[in-house]
């Protein structure tokens, strides 16, 4: 029997050009039904599911014809018939034949699926553990509540510490359950065992106060609380019906624990602030150690290093080495992974290996023509190379696919400032703040700088107060210092000079040129400019377009 199931996902649709392929076996073109036989339909679905990747002839034969005795001629006739159904011509090739390899669908495809049903929410109360040390009990209680709160997207709602922290007696427990009616609660006590501890845990369903599970967990001395939290999470998965962590990413990342670390790391990476990138670096490094054979953490970690270098919070040369190591590791695990190839394309162009970088980007785009990641990396590459119009177009394509991508929005803001001027940049900055980047400190620092350049000092000072002091580092500090110069002129120079003296590797950071120009004068800035130019420094190619450096051009 064939392995192919014609209805793998209810209501799923593939959209390409003016065609819509439904999972009920129907094909529409301009809202008119097109007849497509079962075999041709099955082949088309497999090619579309492959998302631009090559599908071998053997795979198609196995999945569509199964155990039936057929040869390649049957597949060839099927492909021919499918091309006629799609009205292929020389200008509109849908199916590409790769001789000796198989077939590939080579047109942009959008997959439309109905929203996944939201998981049923299960409310959980975590009671303070009984321990000899009250302070340690409170600390552990806080850590477990904070850790398990990360599982909210998967249907677990944890009551906050402020509600449960004083719930220690039977009377307190019964009152809490009666007032808030959580679905489940966890209680526990810690018993010393030499240098280690035994944690005895009970999971109780509140309705009927039914004991679901008891377990003793040994905690070795100095073991982090996160390990206990992960073990509790696994127990909850077994005990509470309907709780389901992200099984797709679990299969890719080996375990629930590594999946949750990865998701937290990706979240921090996407926040795109100095503090969040530092947190992402820690989490993604931890994830790589937990799942050394998974591709996604290596790609995310490579992007994290590049972002930190761009933001001026990590040595650029060292960041490039680290990013390349992780991108190469990802390609070793899957040499056709488009995200890894796109990252290597960006890294090679930063190293002035333009031909290699271009080929890698081309390959990545062929494998994944509608990837927000690839669009962002390529737009970033074009921006750094000084191709502003092309960069803006590509970044806009990225934002259409992923409107919430903070890094792409901020890149677009820089391009707009360089390409069409400060007024357009201020308008775009206000637009981004009203959408997805309300509190992003990089965006705020850029707006402060733009407003200061326009002489709107009071508004700039007001906006500066919205930036957290823990985020004022790297490029954010540079932007705010330049704004201070615009506002206070000569009075700001001592602070700027002090900042420049404290910066390491100033000779490898073209992003400091605007401050060098105002603090040390045109002669010293021009000397740095020529040095970067002679070195063919691509970070310099990004900064030499800055309107503030027009004197040095």
Swiss-Prot record:
One of its GO terms (molecular function) is DNA binding. This is Transcriptional regulator HilA. The modification 4-aspartylphosphate is found at residue 62. Keywords: Activator, DNA-binding, Phosphoprotein, TPR repeat, Transcription, Transcription regulation, Two-component regulatory system, Virulence. The gene is hilA. CDD domains: trans_reg_C (cd00383). It comes from the Bacteria. The keyword Translocase does not apply. Residues 11-107 bind DNA. The keyword Transport does not apply. TPR repeats lie at residues 372-405. SUPFAM superfamilies: C-terminal effector domain of the bipartite response regulators, TPR-like. Pfam families: Trans_reg_C. GO terms for biological process: phosphorelay signal transduction system; regulation of DNA-templated transcription. The main transcriptional regulator of the Salmonella pathogenicity island 1 (SPI1) gene expression. Activates the expression of invasion genes by a direct action at their promoters and also indirectly by increasing the level of invF. Also binds upstream of prgH and directly activates the expression of prgHIJK operon. Induction: Expressed in response to both environmental conditions and genetic regulatory factors. Transcription is subject to complex control and is stimulated by the SPI1-encoded HilC and HilD.
